[in-house]
């Protein structure tokens, strides 16, 4: 008898039983309570059956019980001792936050990304520097080759001038002795006689023979006392050309027609220049002085190398050639003129 009373008392002292009894007295169903408290029907059943779901924190469970008690008009002080048994306060498991590890992984990943970015940047800078150095070295090599070619051209010019001076001095020292024999004077009239074609020139030739025979002793006397006269080769060539008869024909002097591929260059300053035509023939290579003009004609297109593009004005077929891009960069101009 005492056992049944104790069991009944324990049932009454149960939180879920007390709330269910109060609900039934008010004529409410579990569905009505769940709708009014905005809870799940399974949560109301767990409260009335004194179950403590593991997925539900004890703090929330105690709050649901208090809301249920207020709904069915059960004092909270009556339920507090029973709630301590049914829903004891449990220490919540605090899981280790992974923010530190995630931040560490993110930092590591960002570190690799920064290393890769810097590596790409260094590669780009290295390639840019190598490209600039190659262009600078090529320009320096061109300048050195221009200087060597200029030196060789000047050396060739000095050698040619020295050679021409030697030839002039050697020619001035050669002497041509005059023939002292009277045969020279006697032979002169015969050459004049050979040029006559009719009777009148023949008579003139005979008179010249008489004059020559009379003048022969005097000429011989003069020749005996006259020393040899030195005659330069240039003077001999001048005399021979002066003695040669000039043509007096009425034929007009022919002039070459203007070349359609002619190229004219005007120089405002000293400039090194190298020009070849389509056949590979070198039309010019050397230095042009300030104020000079150069006209070239060959087979187009022409391949030009200009040391100072700002010092040259080029006209091809009467049209100016644009050198602006080379002047702006201040580099040696390499261009092709007259390409189809």
Curated annotation (Swiss-Prot):
Gene3D superfamilies: lambda repressor-like DNA-binding domains
Biased composition (Polar residues): 183-201
Localization: Cell inner membrane
UniProt GO MF annotations: DNA binding
Residue spans binding DNA: 30-49
InterPro entries xref list: Bact_Cytoskel_RodZ, Cro/C1-type_HTH, Lambda_DNA-bd_dom_sf, RodZ, RodZ-like_C
Domain notes: The helix-turn-helix (HTH) motif in the cytoplasmic domain of the N-terminus is involved in the formation of spirals to maintain the rigid rod shape. As this protein is anchored in the cytoplasmic membrane, the HTH motif may contribute to protein-protein interactions to form the RodZ helix, which is localized beneath the cytoplasmic membrane. The C-terminal domain may be critical for determination of the rod shape by probably interacting with enzymes required for synthesis of the peptidoglycan layer, including PBPs in the periplasm.
This protein's name: Cytoskeleton protein RodZ
UniProt organism field: Erwinia tasmaniensis (strain DSM 17950 / CFBP 7177 / CIP 109463 / NCPPB 4357 / Et1/99)
Species lineage: Bacteria, Pseudomonadati, Pseudomonadota, Gammaproteobacteria, Enterobacterales
């Amino acid at each position: 008898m005492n056992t049944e009373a104790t069991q009944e008392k324990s049932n009454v002292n149960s939180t879920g039983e007390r709330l269910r009894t109060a609900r039934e007295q008010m004529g409410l169903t579990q569905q009505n309570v769940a709708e009014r408290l905005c809870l799940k029907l399974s949560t109301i059943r767990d409260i009335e059956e004194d179950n403590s779901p593991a997925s539900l924190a004890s703090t929330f469970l105690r709050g649901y019980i208090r809301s249920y008690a207020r709904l069915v008009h059960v004092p909270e002080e009556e339920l507090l001792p029973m709630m301590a048994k049914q829903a004891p306060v449990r220490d919540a498991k605090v899981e280790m936050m992974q923010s530190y590890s995630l931040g560490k992984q993110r930092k590591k990943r960002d570190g690799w990304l920064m290393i890769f970015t810097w590596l790409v940047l260094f590669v780009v800078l290295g390639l840019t520097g190598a490209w600039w150095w190659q262009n600078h070295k090529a320009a320096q090599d061109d300048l050195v080759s221009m200087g060597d070619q200029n030196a060789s051209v000047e050396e060739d010019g000095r050698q040619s001038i020295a050679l021409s001076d030697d030839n002039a001095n050697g020619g001035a020292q050669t002497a041509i002795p005059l023939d002292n024999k009277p045969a020279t004077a006697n032979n002169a009239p015969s050459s004049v006689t050979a040029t006559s074609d009719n009777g009148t020139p023949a008579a003139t030739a005979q008179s010249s023979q008489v004059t020559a025979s009379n003048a022969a002793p005097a000429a011989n006397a003069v020749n005996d006392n006259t020393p040899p006269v030195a005659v330069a080769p240039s003077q001999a060539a001048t005399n021979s050309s002066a003695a040669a008869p000039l043509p007096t024909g009425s034929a007009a002097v022919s002039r070459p027609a203007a070349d359609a591929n002619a190229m004219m260059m005007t120089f405002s300053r000293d400039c090194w220049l190298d020009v070849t035509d389509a056949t590979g023939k070198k039309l010019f290579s050397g230095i042009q002085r300030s104020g000079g003009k150069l006209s070239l004609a060959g087979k187009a297109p022409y391949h030009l190398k200009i040391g100072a593009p700002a010092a040259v004005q080029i006209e091809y077929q009467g049209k100016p050639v644009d050198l602006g891009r080379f002047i702006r960069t201040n580099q040696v101009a390499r261009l092709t003129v007259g390409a189809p």
